[in-house]
Amino acid sequence: MRLTKIIPKIFYEDFKDGLHLFVDGLKFKVVYNDAKLYIIIRDDVTIQLLEDAEYAAKDRPEIRIETDDIAAFYKEVKEAHPELLHPNLNIVKQQPWGLKEFALLDKTTVCVIIQQQ
């Protein structure tokens, strides 16, 4: 038996903010949606977006997504939606702990760090 993935839930007051970050900015595809839930997928990564103002006010997460080609991923984001790049990590940076990283930040302060080993 083994664990195969983690699927985060991210709460938004308004879905459009999450869809801008993940669908427009990171090119996730919507595979399901209803009045309170979107399930989005890109490659092997699945995320659930939930519309709930109470929980959105309580939790603005930071998540990490690993890629095998950070330069191409960065180029894709920078060309399509540079406004989503995090002001504190808006270039690909080699970190002292061995990862290459850049980050995105939406207007609700959900942070997504893209990393490569």
Residue ranges, per PLM feature:
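N-terminal beta-strand motif that seeds the catalytic metal site of vicinal oxygen chelate
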Residues: 1-19, 63
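Short glycine-enriched loop/turn motifs at secondary-structure junctions
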Residues: 1-4, 55-60, 96
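Short beta->alpha transition motifs characteristic of CBS
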Residues: 9-11, 51, 95-98, 103, ...
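Conserved acetyl-CoA-binding loop of GNAT-fold acetyltransferases
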Residues: 25-30, 81-83
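Conserved short beta-strand elements that form part of the metal-binding/catalytic scaffold
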Residues: 29-61, 111-116
